[in-house]
Every structure is written in C-alpha cells, then in structure tokens.
Amino acid sequence: MSACAKSRRSDERLREEQTVPMTLHQSAIDVLGAWRPEDPAQDSLRHAVLAFLDTRADACLRECVPGHITASALVLDHDGTHALLTLHPRVGRWLQLGGHCEPSDPTLIAAALREATEESGIDGLTIAPTPAALHVHPVTCSLGVPTRHLDVQFVVRAHAGAQIAVSDESLDLKWWPLAELPDDTDFGLAQLAHAAKLSGLAK
C-alpha cells in the first residue's frame, strides 16, 4: 500500500472514531432534551446534565474525568412485578444493570440495552425509549480516578420465560419483587423503581 493510500485510510479511520462518539453524544442531548419529567428535582437535574453535555464533547466517555454519562436499566420480568438486580462485585450491593457507554454505541438507548443484554444474558429485551430517571453519584472508576456518574436510567422488559446468565461483571443475578427490594437498596435504584411504577411500566 502506498504512503498516500495509508494516509487516506488513516484519515478515514480517524473520522470514523470521531464520528461515533459525537453520534452518541448527540443522542444523549436529544433524549434528555425531549424528556419532560414531572418531578421538579429531576427536571432541574436534567437541565444540569444537558449543560454539562453542552460544555464537554467527551461527556459520554469514561475518560471524561469531571464526570461522564452512564446508562443503566431496570430490567423487569414480563409481568412487570419483578426486577433483575446484579450483586455488584465492587460495591457489594444489589443494583440495577448498567455501566459505561462505549464509543461503538450508536445511541444512549443502545448503550443501556447493550449493558442490560450483556449483564443479564437475556436476548430480545425491549426498552422504553424515554428515560425513567436520572441519578448522579460520586464514584472511583476502574481507571482509579475519582469522578461522577451521570446515570441516565431506562426501563427494560424481558420476555416471558427469559433465562438469565451471570456474567463476569456480576457476583450474582436475582429477580427481586419490586415490593420487596433489598433492605440496603441504593437511593438511585429506589428512585428508579418508583419512577417505573409511576410511569405504569412496572406494577
């Protein structure tokens, strides 16, 4: 391959790498911009996250040290009465599924669905396209740097008879009745479950 051809190929690859995060970034702006939460505190937080997205082109990537968008999912069973929770290895608590966005994720919704699928082992999940809640919390990521997760939370539904499979990102998976979540339930999870019930997506 000639030097010119190599240069063109390198330029094309660079453009692709730059385009994918910006598509993800724009989708986060679009999703949060269209969402109208009824809770004033959630709406105020939505505006704050949108302002952060406006100032940081890398806001959806884990390398963004001041904080970054994450995508999580409350995976419900077919009846909407139970939530699939993961026993998180680093936190040591039962949490909803989710995690960091990847540059290959075309949209924020796709990121949440990918995380839910990978961590549950369930194919054919369906996701509500509108966020259920937002939650911001401090965390030290795998990179070892203190940061914040600006977590956009969605509701996902499993098909009847769905079989779960524990991934290497979890110590365990368990279906919990929404009316009997763990005693030490994280505020973000409790808020998400409440929002899912208010929206009619959960029972």
Language-model-detected regions and their locations in the chain:
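Alpha-helical and coiled-coil interaction segments, frequently adjacent to or embedded
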Residues: 12-48
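Conserved Nudix-box catalytic region and its N-terminal flanking loop in Nudix hydrolases
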Residues: 81-122, 179
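NUDIX/MutT-family hydrolases
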Residues: 164-195
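Intrinsic disorder/low-complexity segments enriched in small, polar and charged residues
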Residues: 1-8, 203
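Short, well-ordered beta-strand micro-motif
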Residues: 75, 155-157, 174-177
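Acidic, metal-coordinating catalytic segment for phosphate/diphosphate chemistry
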Residues: 36-72
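Active-site segment of metal-dependent pyrophosphate-handling enzymes
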Residues: 121-162
